[in-house]
């Protein structure tokens, strides 16, 4: 995926080879070809399916990057199962995990390298170390590139839980 290190911030995705889309797929996501087809047919620059996090209640997506909520709760308000129950059409979010994410050619070409890097967030009195998916979502926001999620694409997320006394 990386370009040539000697190109510094001007690195090209796949060394400049042609591509149409890139799909991020976590190794613990369970999906069907029709899930992919739904994302692809929307023809958006950045389109994601939804998957539940380990609490089995919230999705790895944040509709509103609400720093007041973060300061009060120590995290952002992740989409809840009830939040998508009546939605039929794709909608914008400000953050999404990269477990099942389709990105169209042209998006990475607008972002300076490094595309992914850990971020140290400072939101008022709160400080948080965030991973590369947060960084990329913030970069997309600064470039006014919207992130969409498809409420009808809810893929499986295999999690194994170890319980101890």
Regions found by a protein language model. Give the residues of each.
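Active-site-proximal beta-strand/loop segments in catalytic clefts of secreted hydrolases
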Residues: 25-27, 50-52, 152-153
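Conserved catalytic core of nucleotide-sugar-dependent glycosyltransferases
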Residues: 32-120
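Surface-exposed, flexible loop/turn segments at secondary-structure boundaries
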Residues: 30, 54-55, 155, 163
